[in-house]
Amino acid sequence: MKYEMVIGKDFRYNVCRKGVEHIIFTDEVAPKEKGVELEDLSNDFDGSVVGWIKDGTYKVSTQTKGQKVIFNEDSSYMFHERIGSYIKSIDFNNIDTSHVTNMRGMFAFCENLEELDLNNFDTSNVIDMNNMFDGCSSLTSLDLRNFNTSNVYKCQLKNVQF
């Protein structure tokens, strides 16, 4: 198993639900209780990455202790607009972004996000960060200290104010 997620746009369509305000990337095992439905979010559709909703939180997990969720090479528009208007927080503690090359529009129009902790992002292979934070009107804190932009050739930030 590769534990790699679907492309960003496909993830966005799976998560788009009213009532989901938080997203957590984890390695915890999904609860086996009535009303909790698992969605296969793995790129190979092998169940290595699954998602479920519980109490307004969408959890994305490998269900394997110590195994991080590997973001797809194309993670563009992952949290863009369609879900962005609902999401208040995203916990990126259990992720691997080392294979990502495209982060275009990743957080664009996440209107309710106030802060983003992206310290766990490995951006060393990213070439496109264009409009990554476009329209994030509530964003007041954004820590990009660990961003390696040496390979980025597209990075336009418009309508972003800090």
Regions found by a protein language model. Give the residues of each.
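Negatively charged
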Residues: M1-F162
